[in-house]
C-alpha cells in the first residue's frame, strides 16, 4: 500500500482536488456549523409578481450534505440573515445552542457576509473591529464589534468543549463585488487569520484565496437567484470536506486525540 497519498505534498494547495468520501474529515464525528443562509441551505424564490422569498431547507445545507457523505453528526447552528452579534446576543440562547448535549468535536464558522452588510449600512453601528477587541481570557470583556462577537462564539464553545477544533471560513471572491465591499471582505479574512493565532485549536479555511471565484459561469451553474442552488450546496460540502482533509493531513499531530474530545480521557504522551 502506498501511503504517500496521506502525506502533504510539497506544493499542495487546499482544493487542488476534491477528495472522494471526505478523506480525513471523517475523523470528525460531531460537527457544528455556525453560519447564515449559506449554512442553512437557503433557497430564493420569486413569484410572478417579482416578490422574493427566502427559505431555509436544512437538508440541502452543505452541513447535511457533509453528514451524509462522511457519516458524522452535523448540527445546523445557523439561520438566514445571521450575524455574529445576533448569534451571541439572542439567537444561540433562544435555540439552546450552548447546551452541553450539543457539544461537538469540531465547529465550522461561516459568518461575516451579513456582518459586512451591517458595517456598510450608515444607520448601523456595527464595525468589523480589531484583534485588540478580543480578551482571550474573558469573552465578557470583548468589544461589541464583529470580531469581538465572533471570538465570543469560539470562546463560549471552548468553555463547554475545551479541546474542540474550530475552522474559520473566509468569504469567496465574487466578480461583481464593488471595491468597498471587497476591502471589507479582505479585512474579514485578515481578522480570522489573526484570531486563529490568538485562540487555541483554530484553523482558517481560506475560501477567499483557494475556492473558485463566483463569476458569471459559476453563478449560472450553482446559484438560484442570490443564493446557492442544490448543486451549489453539494459542491460547497465537497469543497469543505476536502479542505478539512487538507488541514488534518497537514497537522496530523493536532488531531491524534480527536477521538478523546468530549470524553474524560486523554493520552498524556501526545499533544492535544
Question: What name fits each language-model region?
Answer:
Residues 2-78, 95-99, 249, 253:
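Serine-esterase "nucleophile elbow" of acetyl-processing enzymes
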Residues 32-34, 74-78, 105-110, 165-170, ...:
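Structural recognition of the beta-strand scaffold that forms the well-ordered cores
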Residues 37-40, 79-85, 113-118, 172-176, ...:
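Solvent-exposed loop/turn segments at secondary-structure junctions
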Residues 44-131, 135-144, 148, 265:
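Conserved SGNH/GDSL esterase-like catalytic core that processes O-acyl groups on lipids
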Residues 67, 99, 154-159, 196-197:
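N-terminal cationic-hydrophobic initiation segments that often serve targeting/anchoring roles
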Residues 150-155, 189:
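Generic structural signal for well-ordered alpha-helices
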Residues 162-163, 200:
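Proline-centered flexible-loop/turn and helix-kink motifs
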Residues 171-272:
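Catalytic His-Asp segment of secreted/periplasmic serine-dependent ester chemistry enzymes
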